Amino acid sequence: TTTTFLQIASSRSGRALLTKETGISSPKLLHWARRAELMKIKDLGRDYADLLEAVGVESVSELRRRNPESLHESMQKINIKAKIVERMPSIKRVNRWIEDSQHIEIKVSS
């Protein structure tokens, strides 16, 4: 499950074990773990996570530091070019993601 994956992949030693067992690189596992942690935020699914990644937000800690208006504007600009999502999230939703990110316990370490 995602929960089990996060428990194991949240640490370097866990990722090393997974790399040994699966052959998947540690950086790829770290990316997936950060993505899974980010997707714990309500209404933030895969497509929106892809859009956030396109503007440089790849983790909960990065989302926490963002200004909602600037982030929303960057997301709009990228989405016009790359067409990542069909429906842009509202500024209210982006603001809620940032607020909700404050309450997510970050377990994934670099």
Tell what function each PLM region has:
Residues 1-110:
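C-terminal extensions
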